[in-house]
Amino acid sequence: MEPFLLLLLVLLPAIVLVRYAFTYGHRTSTMPIGPPTLPFIGNIHQITKKYTHIKFTEWAAQYGGLYMLKIGNGNMAVITDRRLVKEVLDRKSGIYSHRPHSFVSHDLITKGNHLLVMHYGDQWRTFRRLVHQHLMETMVENHHTKIVNAEAIQLVRDYMIDPEHHMAHPKRYSNSITNSIVFGIRTANREGANMRRLYKLMEEWSEVMETGATPPVDLFPWLKLLPQWLFNNYIDRAKAIGVQMETLYVDILNKVIKRREDGHNNGTFMDKVLDSQEKHNLPWHQLAFIGGVLMEGGSDTSSSLTLAIVQALIQNPDVQRKAHAEIDAVVGHNRSPVWEDFEKLPYINMIIKEGHRWRPILPLCFPHALGEDDWVDGKFLPKGTIVVVNTWGMHMDPSQPDDPAAFIPERFAKHPQLAPDYVPGTWERRDHYGYGVGRRICPGIHLAERNMFLGIAKLLWAFDFQPGEGPIDSDPVTGYHNGFLYCAKDYSCRPVIRNEVIRDTIEREYATATADVFSRFTEG
């Protein structure tokens, strides 16, 4: 062989490799800036596996409200700027409402039928439309609030008669509301079988969805060829979660179908979906998942936020005193707060908004994906870019007037309305981002607002929350579980009933709720 050809054969692969080393895994000059990258892997080595939102917030302080991470040769834009959230995720929602494909969550766990990870398209629109019809504000106001009010008085009674298990009571509360509305099957106590199965499932799914918990197979498909034991058997773990999920959802759906076969159509969400099956013709797996998804979304989020707020109340007795004074002046002790008291109890609304800000349940919004090329503030975002809204970073903005680490409800004194009222307004007026953004905003926002108001208002009406025997760690790292959902670790709590009149009122209202509301539902 000629020496020149031999040299060419040797140099050509080296030239190609060097070229890829300078391009693969690196940002182009037109993209937003970000942390320094390494050839081929980009920023993968720098993304923490735990409490990723805190690292993303540190980078936001260094690189600004929009920066780009390279995940291999893929792109991840992180937004920690309220103005950009409005201009990009809200105003351009048609191209920013997609989801990045996930081999683990989409293919292995949900088979693409979970509303949270579902790709943007006709199936998503059908699911969303069905959910909206049952959870729009008028439906919640006219049909669901009476259920919330009844479950909230049981929440108070549970704290009163069983303070030892205070961490479990908000979970029962939110799960029972959701299951009653969706299936007509309430959760009567903290030992409810459906609830226990759901929270076990959610805990395992949250862990596997945390950044870094599984190999980046969507960016490096060849990783699927490697033995899964190298990555903590992630395929088997994901499939097992999928089996748990499908089995639970199908079991509950079958109970609804059996009840209907016995001649009882209770007008629940699933009853209405089944009534419209001739029109929508949803496959069996989708039929099971549309109800299961609502059970998930309504159970874990409200309960986690309630636990965070109670924790904050224990550590801030002045906040409790102000709330007690407001409630006593409006409500008294012979009845508990009801939804009609909302406008007269603005401080309770401030406490809830501050809870959303202080410990958001989703510190990082579930990732969006860009459907086509876009330019944002003169920077290029290619089609397929993963877009992460850093809720934690926006809520903990150090430029705000009050200490972002402190629990100060008064920072929302100029936000007297419910969260949905601020979503369509200007970015300067948005209260918080606890329910997400754009077209992917939580479809149960109206129900969730009533869950939170009635739950927190009644708890504060009834109790003085004091420290129990044991630690109360509210640190955002050491005091909170790592995972996709952000929830407080167990903490001590001593709920002290405020007086005997309130105790008697609780028992009387609970008896009324049992007779008038709970009796309409089966238990599970």
Swiss-Prot record:
Residues bearing carbohydrate: N266
Principal subcellular localization: endoplasmic reticulum
Ranges annotated as spanning the membrane: 5-22
Database matches in SUPFAM superfamilies: Cytochrome P450
Its membrane topology: Single-pass membrane protein
Phenotype of gene-disrupted mutants: Completely abolishes the production of patulin and leads to the production of a distinct dark-red pigment.
UniProt xrefs under InterPro entries: Cyt_P450 (IPR001128), Cyt_P450_E_grp-I (IPR002401), Cyt_P450_sf (IPR036396), Cytochrome_P450_fung (IPR050364)
Record carries keyword ATP-binding: no
Biotechnological applications: Patulin was originally used as an antibiotic and specifically trialed to be used against the common cold, but it is no longer used for that purpose since it has been shown to induce immunological, neurological and gastrointestinal effects. Genotoxic effects of patulin with dose-dependent increase in DNA strand breaks in brain, liver and kidneys have been detected in mice. However, more recently, it has been proposed that patulin might also have anti-tumor properties.
Catalysed reaction, written as an equation: 3-methylphenol + reduced [NADPH--hemoprotein reductase] + O2 = 3-hydroxybenzyl alcohol + oxidized [NADPH--hemoprotein reductase] + H2O + H(+)
Pathway(s): Mycotoxin biosynthesis; patulin biosynthesis
Induction notes from the record: Expression is correlated with the production of patulin. Expression is positively regulated by the secondary metabolism regulator laeA. Expression is strongly decreased with increased sucrose concentrations. This decrease is lost in the presence of malic acid. Expression is increased with pH changes from 2.5 to 3.5 in the presence of a limiting concentration of sucrose, 50 mM. Natural phenols present in apple fruits such as chlorogenic acid or the flavonoid epicatechin modulate patulin biosynthesis.
EC number: 1.-.-.-
Positions with a binding annotation for heme: C442
GO molecular function terms attached to this record: heme binding; iron ion binding; monooxygenase activity; oxidoreductase activity, acting on paired donors, with incorporation or reduction of molecular oxygen; polyketide synthase activity
Cytoplasmic side: 1-4
Location in or out of the cell: Endoplasmic reticulum membrane
CC per GO annotation: endoplasmic reticulum; endoplasmic reticulum membrane
Entry function: Cytochrome P450 monooxygenase; part of the gene cluster that mediates the biosynthesis of patulin, an acetate-derived tetraketide mycotoxin produced by several fungal species that shows antimicrobial properties against several bacteria. PatH catalyzes the conversion of m-cresol into m-hydroxybenzyl alcohol. The pathway begins with the synthesis of 6-methylsalicylic acid by the polyketide synthase (PKS) patK via condensation of acetate and malonate units.
Family affiliation: Belongs to the cytochrome P450 family.
Protein name (database record): Cytochrome P450 monooxygenase patH
GN (gene name): patH
